[in-house]
Amino acid sequence: MTHSQYIFGFHAITSRLRQHPDSIKEIYLDTNRHDQRARDLMSLAETTSTRLILCEQDRLCKMTGTTRHQGVAAHVTKLRRYATLEDLLEGLTEPALLLVLDGVKDPHNLGACLRVADAFGVHAVVVPKDRAVGLSATVHKVASGAVDTVPFFAVTNLARTLRELKEMGLWIVGTAADAPDTLDSVTLTRPLAWVLGAEDGGMRRLTREACDLLVSIPMSGSIESLNVSVSAGICLFETFRQHSQRTGSGLNVPAPKNAV
């Protein structure tokens, strides 16, 4: 099992430098980058005593497997902040909020879901080990640093994990277009895990059966379904909104800032 990987893109690498500089083995920067972003990255690398190597575009393409690396890549060790979900949940001082993704295969969707999870104070994102994308370099880039702030768990048996979460006191709520209950009709202030299905077929049968409740997202247009990251954003915002109304503040979310 490999414990290191390459990530790319200025947002992803800058976030890793600020959050976990010790996890970076070295940074590779396009020798032709002389702009402000490159200079800022070089300065931050120097401040954190991180090795930075100037190299050619071809080398960056081979490292990352893409031409869309923005001229920068980093060789990093994988982060591991909690041994188990149970460890994470036991340390919480507020109602747990998890995002469970069943079989999401598109790295852009997973990256966007992680970014949304960070925005609304999700305590962890959970995925199955098989038939789902992992934390690839593309996921790091799309997530814009959220990989470094949101704990991520890949589990062997998702349905069993959901049952274990129930035993730990979480309410398991899934989304389904045919669900009779709508998102805006449900109280979401208790500890819960949102479960969203894959881009093509939605939740698998055993995952769906493990849910305590299924809800649909009210829509008035002609499109029958939404991108999984859009659905995640809507569900998590409604959860955050209800927590804010109940307590005067949301979950563990930083002060509001302009969206990018």
Curated annotation (Swiss-Prot):
<dbReference type="InterPro" id="IPR004441">
    <property type="entry name" value="rRNA_MeTrfase_TrmH"/>
</dbReference>
<feature type="binding site">
    <location>
        <position position="217"/>
    </location>
    <ligand>
        <name>S-adenosyl-L-methionine</name>
    </ligand>
</feature>
<dbReference type="InterPro" id="IPR029064">
    <property type="entry name" value="Ribosomal_eL30-like_sf"/>
</dbReference>
<dbReference type="GO" id="GO:0005829">
    <property type="term" value="C:cytosol"/>
</dbReference>
<dbReference type="Pfam" id="PF00588">
    <property type="entry name" value="SpoU_methylase"/>
</dbReference>
<dbReference type="Pfam" id="PF08032">
    <property type="entry name" value="SpoU_sub_bind"/>
</dbReference>
<feature type="binding site">
    <location>
        <position position="226"/>
    </location>
    <ligand>
        <name>S-adenosyl-L-methionine</name>
    </ligand>
</feature>
<comment type="function">
    <text>Specifically methylates the ribose of guanosine 2251 in 23S rRNA.</text>
</comment>
<dbReference type="InterPro" id="IPR024915">
    <property type="entry name" value="23S_rRNA_MeTrfase_RlmB"/>
</dbReference>
<keyword id="KW-0963">Cytoplasm</keyword>
<keyword id="KW-0808">Transferase</keyword>
<dbReference type="InterPro" id="IPR013123">
    <property type="entry name" value="SpoU_subst-bd"/>
</dbReference>
<dbReference type="GO" id="GO:0070039">
    <property type="term" value="F:rRNA (guanosine-2'-O-)-methyltransferase activity"/>
</dbReference>
<feature type="binding site">
    <location>
        <position position="197"/>
    </location>
    <ligand>
        <name>S-adenosyl-L-methionine</name>
    </ligand>
</feature>
<dbReference type="InterPro" id="IPR029026">
    <property type="entry name" value="tRNA_m1G_MTases_N"/>
</dbReference>
<keyword id="KW-0949">S-adenosyl-L-methionine</keyword>
<keyword id="KW-0489">Methyltransferase</keyword>
<dbReference type="InterPro" id="IPR001537">
    <property type="entry name" value="SpoU_MeTrfase"/>
</dbReference>
<comment type="similarity">
    <text>Belongs to the class IV-like SAM-binding methyltransferase superfamily. RNA methyltransferase TrmH family. RlmB subfamily.</text>
</comment>
<dbReference type="GO" id="GO:0003723">
    <property type="term" value="F:RNA binding"/>
</dbReference>
<protein>
    <recommendedName>
        <fullName>23S rRNA (guanosine-2'-O-)-methyltransferase RlmB</fullName>
        <ecNumber>2.1.1.185</ecNumber>
    </recommendedName>
</protein>
<dbReference type="InterPro" id="IPR029028">
    <property type="entry name" value="Alpha/beta_knot_MTases"/>
</dbReference>
<keyword id="KW-0698">rRNA processing</keyword>
